[in-house]
Amino acid sequence: MSQGQAIAIFGDQMATELLEVTSDIKRIDQGGWWAVTQTFEGNFAAYRFAHVQPLDDASLRELQNSQGLVQDSGIPVASWKSSMTAELYRHAVNTIRQDIARGWVYQANLCRILAAPLNADLDVIGLWRLLRANNPAPYLSALLVPAADAGLESDVRIVSASPELF
């Protein structure tokens, strides 16, 4: 099920009006604003957008009104599962701090997996808004490309809560 128009939100920029979808990496050298994806298997896709604007509250309200989006993702908080308990996470952080103090490492990335059952019609931008309100990662992003807009078999739906630049 497709939701609204194609949109890409990366950091403090919002892009709309999908112009092109390609799997040819050379196309991005020809200019424009592109959202680029690559799967773990190495499949590349790029989505070129016509309109890019700063992300602000007014543009978010306009987007919500134009797409009929809800305020949240519709995923009950209790349904989220973590690969680590809070106690295990704190222990891992303390272990890393000790290893840094000993000089054994100078940087470590502690990761955990959060998972929840998702409906096929998940409001991607609603999930992005929920993450933005509760986990303000500096490079929070979302990409929604309805299949009908891009000639694809299925929608592209990506939400990332990355603390690091892409």
Language-model segments: which ranges?
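Extended alpha-helical targeting/anchoring segments
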Residues: 1-166
